Each structure stands twice: as structure tokens, then as C-alpha cells.
């Protein structure tokens, strides 16, 4: 996901905030089922109260200040899909953050997620459409929280890797449908075939404890976006389903999201044996 940022006021967003917003957008696009989200481009502008009022008047016939505006582009080029522009009044966001009792960054992130779903075609003109849009926002926020937690656990697990041969650290953490978390690191062996990948260690621990269904799996390693090997993908197939989220992370705000079918298409599983 490509995010371009334009600052047209005296607000200076931190690099962490921009990374978090980009991660929120990737999560929202995944929730919406957008294929190839890396090719999507979104423009984010921070503006003054005067500018957002002018935009609101010129494009929505409302001569009043507001907190955020969305301008869908829906333009596709050979290399990128331009989803649209998001414009946030940081002054209004700061006022709302004080009223609600949370930080400015948190308010800006929520406004950005809210606006993302406007770009994706959602609205809140009536109670039902408002409910549907709000559910999408909640789903995105909840998934981001799970990604944060599991990525942190996977990064911590990576430090426990036993890797005298490859010197390549991998950590994994999974959450079951009951909310239990199991973590693992790669454990190598002089007889290379006995080596166990981090994902396998986590899944074996889970299975031993009696859990059988994975809601989300996070994997992190020394390489840029360390993906599960073929054996791990097949083992994951035993305990995952179409709703399982696979997170391939460098850190908690730099990750890719996949479904099982994306990383293991045309797979063989228990149902093929009528189990």
C-alpha cells in the first residue's frame, strides 16, 4: 500500500504515526478483501480549519468546518490503483481528542480508518449503512490489535531460536479461536531433516494443548518478509480455514496480510479424506 502525505498546516506528524496509519490502511484493505493491496495508493493531507471548510463548501455544499473529508478517485493505471484522497483537519481532530479523552494520534488514526471506508464505498446516511460501516471499522481496529500482539510475541519468540547452522532467526505466534496464544522459534539439528521451523513449533504446542483451529498466525524472521516454507504451509492447512489471517511481519507496523488460499492454493486437506 502506497501512502503519500501532504502537510498543509503547521502540524508535524511523527514517522511512527505515518507508519501506523499505513498499517491501518493495509489492515482495512485486507478486511475489505482488496486483492494486491500493495498496488493501492492513497493520498493523506493535513490541513487548516479554513481549508477543510472551503473544501466542504465547494464539494459538499456545506459551509462549515468538519474533521475529515474523503474524495474517491477510483483510477487505475498500469502500475497502481488510485483509491482517493483523505483530508484531515488536525485542529478539529485535536478538539475531538480532548473531548473523548485520548491522544491526538489515536484520533487521527480513527479518522483515517473511517475515511478509508468512505473511499471503499461505505457511508452512514441511514442507521443500517452506519451500522455496516461501523462494523467494518471495528473489525479493522480489532484485527490491528491482534496483529500488534502476535507480532510482538513472534519478535520475542525469535530471540529463543536455536540456530547453530543457519544463524537465521525465525519467530512465530498464533492465536486460536478461543483466544489462546502459542509461540515458537526455529530449532535446528545436526541432522538437518529433524530441524523444526518456528511455525511448526507453535502449531505443535497448540495441538498438544488440545486446540485445533488457528484464527491468526504471525511470522517474522531475519529476512525482509520471511514467509512460511512449503511444509509449514501444509501443516497450517490442517488447522486453518478460509478466515485464518497469516501475518508476515518485519515489525508491528510493517507487515503483509494473506489468506491461506493465497499462500497455498489448490491445497489438500482433511476434507479431501472426508475428515
Predicted regions, residues:
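An acidic/histidine-cluster motif and surrounding catalytic segment
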Residues: 1-109, 119-145
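Short beta-strand scaffold segments in enzyme catalytic cores
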Residues: 167-176
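Short, well-ordered amphipathic alpha-helical segments that serve as non-catalytic structural scaffolds
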Residues: 22-26, 153-156, 198-205
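Zn2+-dependent cytidine deaminase-like catalytic core
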Residues: 183-272
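Short, basic/aromatic recognition patches
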Residues: 149-163
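Short loop/turn motifs at secondary-structure junctions and domain boundaries
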Residues: 37, 163-166
Amino acid at each position: 500500500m502506497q501512502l503519500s502525505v501532504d502537510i498543509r498546516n503547521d502540524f508535524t506528524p511523527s514517522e511512527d504515526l505515518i507508519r501506523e496509519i499505513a498499517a491501518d490502511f493495509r489492515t482495512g484493505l485486507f478486511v475489505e478483501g482488496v486483492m494486491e493491496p500493495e498496488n493501492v495508493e492513497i493520498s493523506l493531507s493535513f490541513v487548516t480549519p479554513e481549508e477543510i471548510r472551503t473544501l466542504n463548501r465547494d464539494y459538499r455544499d456545506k459551509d462549515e468546518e468538519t474533521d475529515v473529508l474523503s474524495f474517491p478517485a477510483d483510477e487505475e493505471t498500469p502500475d497502481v490503483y488510485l483509491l482517493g484522497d483523505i483530508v484531515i483537519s488536525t485542529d478539529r481532530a485535536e478538539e475531538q481528542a480532548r473531548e473523548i479523552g485520548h491522544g491526538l494520534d489515536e484520533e487521527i488514526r480513527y479518522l483515517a480508518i473511517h475515511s478509508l471506508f468512505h473511499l471503499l464505498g461505505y457511508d452512514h446516511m441511514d442507521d443500517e449503512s452506519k451500522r455496516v460501516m461501523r462494523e467494518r471499522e471495528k473489525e479493522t481496529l480489532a484485527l490491528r490489535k491482534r496483529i500488534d500482539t502476535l507480532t510482538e510475541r513472534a519478535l520475542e519468540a525469535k530471540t529463543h531460536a536455536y540456530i547453530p547452522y543457519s544463524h537465521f532467526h525465525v519467530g512465530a505466534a498464533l492465536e486460536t479461536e478461543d483466544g489462546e496464544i502459542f509461540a515458537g522459534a526455529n530449532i535446528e539439528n545436526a541432522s538437518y531433516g529433524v530441524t523444526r521451523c518456528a511455525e511448526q513449533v507453535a502449531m505443535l504446542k497448540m495441538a498438544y494443548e488440545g486446540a485445533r483451529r488457528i484464527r491468526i498466525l504471525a511470522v517474522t524472521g531475519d529476512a525482509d518478509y520471511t514467509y512460511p516454507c512449503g511444509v509449514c504451509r501444509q501443516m497450517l492447512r490442517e488447522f486453518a480455514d478460509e478466515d485464518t489471517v497469516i501475518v508476515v511481519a518485519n515489525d508491528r507496523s510493517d507487515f503483509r496480510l494473506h489468506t491461506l488460499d493465497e499462500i497455498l492454493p489448490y491445497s489438500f486437506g482433511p476434507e479431501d479424506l472426508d475428515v
